């Protein structure tokens, strides 16, 4: 099954023929919302809005581990595509311009970076 995580501006998939929604509990807390299951053509898809339905969760509060666990372990997704949009600071790049960044400001510090953060579980490489 294919999982799609929608970022800002993508809180639903218009081409998704929805079959049901499901709330998934995870060992990492609550994901951003209920998972939406359905099909796009012949492809089974599960969708999750990263910032919650209604865009109520700011980026620094998104529970990334719960989202990934819910989609992979909870829903059985074997592939995950995440769609995102970002802001920019260059006036000469209009909205809709596709760029490949070569300098990145990383605001991901201060949050868990792994699913394996316990000394009780041996590291697997």
What do the predicted segments below correspond to?
Residues 1-125:
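Metabolite-binding pocket within alpha/beta catalytic cores that recognizes anionic/polar moieties
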């Amino acid at each position: 099954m294919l999982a799609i995580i929608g970022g800002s501006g993508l809180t639903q998939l218009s081409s998704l023929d929805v079959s049901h929604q499901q709330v998934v509990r995870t060992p990492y807390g609550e994901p951003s919302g209920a998972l939406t299951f359905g099909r796009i053509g012949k492809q089974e898809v599960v969708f999750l809005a990263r910032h919650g339905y209604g865009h109520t969760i700011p980026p620094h509060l998104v529970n990334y581990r719960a989202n990934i666990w819910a989609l992979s372990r909870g829903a059985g997704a074997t592939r995950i595509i995440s769609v995102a949009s970002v802001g920019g600071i260059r006036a000469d790049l209009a909205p809709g311009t596709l760029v490949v960044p070569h300098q990145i400001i990383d605001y991901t510090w201060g949050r868990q970076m792994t699913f394996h953060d316990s000394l009780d579980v041996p590291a697997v490489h």
